[in-house]
Amino acid sequence: MANTSKVVKAARGHKFAVQNYNRCSRCGRARGYYRFFGMCRICIRELAHKGELPGVKKASW
């Protein structure tokens, strides 16, 4: 889990736009971020398994 201070620091933004980075809206994780969902891969997986993400289903081929 990310520290609260890191989440607040990321939300403030930087002087240069290149230095800004995304964090998961649920847990604050910085890596494995999916922009479409605004969450990290772990949170997306948890919500998808619970059926709380509409239109997302487990792949099978």
UniProtKB/Swiss-Prot annotation:
Keywords: Metal-binding, Ribonucleoprotein, Ribosomal protein, RNA-binding, rRNA-binding, Zinc. Gene3D superfamilies: 30s Ribosomal Protein S14, Chain N. Zn(2+) binds at C24, C27, C40, C43. GO terms for molecular function: rRNA binding; structural constituent of ribosome; zinc ion binding. The keyword RNA-binding applies. Its cofactor is Zn(2+). InterPro entries: Ribosomal_uS14 (IPR001209), Ribosomal_uS14_bact (IPR023053), Ribosomal_uS14_CS (IPR018271), Ribosomal_uS14_sf (IPR043140). Transmembrane segments: none annotated. It holds the Pfam family Ribosomal_S14. One of its GO terms (cellular component) is cytoplasm. Binds 1 zinc ion per subunit. GO terms for biological process: translation. NCBIfam families: PRK08061.1 (NF005974). Belongs to the universal ribosomal protein uS14 family. Zinc-binding uS14 subfamily. Binds 16S rRNA, required for the assembly of 30S particles and may also be responsible for determining the conformation of the 16S rRNA at the A site. Part of the 30S ribosomal subunit. Contacts proteins S3 and S10. This is Small ribosomal subunit protein uS14. It comes from Deinococcus geothermalis (strain DSM 11300 / CIP 105573 / AG-3a).
